[in-house]
Amino acid sequence: MNYPDFDLQKINENIYSAQCIGNVEPIEFMIPYPSMSALIEGQNIKYSNQTIIAKPKITNLDFFNYIQNTANWLESIGVKPRQPVAIPKLEYPQSEILIYGIWQIGAVGVLRGHTAKKNLTSQLNEIAILSDDINLFDEAKQFSNKYNPKYKPNLGEEALITFETGDGIKLSHYNLLVNANSIQKALNLKSRTKIYCNI
């Protein structure tokens, strides 16, 4: 008896595609309360070996591991869920990794712009202010890249406060996801397009 030749890779791709709702992949809608960090986890299921930062060369999996290291480091220095954390101006891509580490523990990132540190402490309760002189890679590398979040924020919870235009503007995880999606549509960006970002 002759059996037909099946392309298992193609079958798996078709099954995965059938599980998508529009451009939302299964991992993104199966997590009860998706957030920015949930999307990074989802990217690693399908694109773990894709290079997302050219210099230094960092893949999706490397980025995720740096986030995990950073989350463990942040906990070790006393950062708590929902606590605002001022993001220092670090060498690229350390600030970008730091913000995801902040979100991974359920804390809130603060872009201070030109606002003085003392003004931040008067406007935000219990803000953690990190030094501009740290090297995140050196600080976090001694910590495990396994991190189990004790708190996962809901979409409506604060993710980012920005003082770059004066008064603080508060953005939730939902706001960030919607804004990113709107930018993607406005610029007609296709899936897997690489963009340079330097916080």
Q: Over which residues does each language-model region extend?
A:
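Conserved ATP-dependent adenylate/AMP-binding module captured primarily in the ANL superfamily
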Residues: I99, G109-D133, N179-Y196
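A generic structural signal for well-ordered alpha-helical segments
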Residues: Q43-N44, I102, T121
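N-lobe entry segment of adenylate-forming
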Residues: M1-I77, P81, Q142-T162
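Short acidic capping loops at alpha-helix termini that bridge into adjacent secondary structure
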Residues: P81-P84, L155-G156, H173-Y174, S191-T193
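ANL superfamily adenylate-forming
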Residues: Q123-K185
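Conserved AMP-binding/adenylate-forming
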Residues: P32, A54-K57, A71-T115, K194-I199
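Short loop/turn segments at beta->alpha junctions
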Residues: T59, A116-K117, S172
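Short secondary-structure boundary/capping elements
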Residues: S35, D62-N69, L90, Q94, ...
